[in-house]
Amino acid sequence: KLLVDAVQSSKFITQKKSRELIHKLEKLVSVYEAKQLQRQVVVTNRNKTINENIYYNIDMIYNGISGDVKIRFQYFSWNIEKEMELRRDGAFYEVSPLVLSWDDENYYMIGYDAEAQLIKHYRVDKMLHIRMSDESREGKEHFKKLDMADYAKKSFGMFRGKETSVK
């Protein structure tokens, strides 16, 4: 029941994929228990993603990490009319994927951008057309120095910029 509730309430899983996952979970239990799983969890102020490719994105990122290669992808944001807009005029990003992290119900890929010489993060549900590169990953020495808990606390849900103390 907890797994069904988690799937239904998770915003990074589309409605269609939620139904498919729950149907698979129902096959693992008796008919009586399956009927109990057919319920709706009410979650307020929650929009589910429309990006059906999130599962493939996660697989491609993990393949890049395990294959020790960079990945290429397009990245988008939503404009004020709630329309998808590709960033960088649709140009592909090339990043060395380091790790996937889940924060505040969003999956993030943390990776090294060799061009900017920075560790950056990208929401996985806003990544499109992910492909593995032939180039080896870079930035491992930067990642070894990274305190993931501190990075997540300072970065996720925030805009990038210099950290400044305010009096």
Descriptions of predicted regions:
Residues 70-91, 135-148:
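Short, conserved active-site entrance elements at the starts or edges of catalytic domains
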Residues 1-5, 88, 108, 116:
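Short, basic/aromatic recognition patches that contact phosphate-bearing ligands
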Residues 97-99:
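Short, surface-exposed charged micro-motifs
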Residues 74-76, 103, 112, 125:
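Structured loops at beta-to-helix junctions and adjacent beta-edge loops in soluble globular domains
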Residues 91-94, 161:
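Short solvent-exposed loop/turn micro-motifs enriched in small/polar/acidic residues
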Residues 2-82:
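Bulky hydrophobic/aromatic content
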Residues 68-70, 101-108:
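Coil-to-beta-strand transition motifs
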Residues 109-167:
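Surface-exposed, charged, gly/pro-rich loop-and-adjacent secondary-structure segments at domain edges
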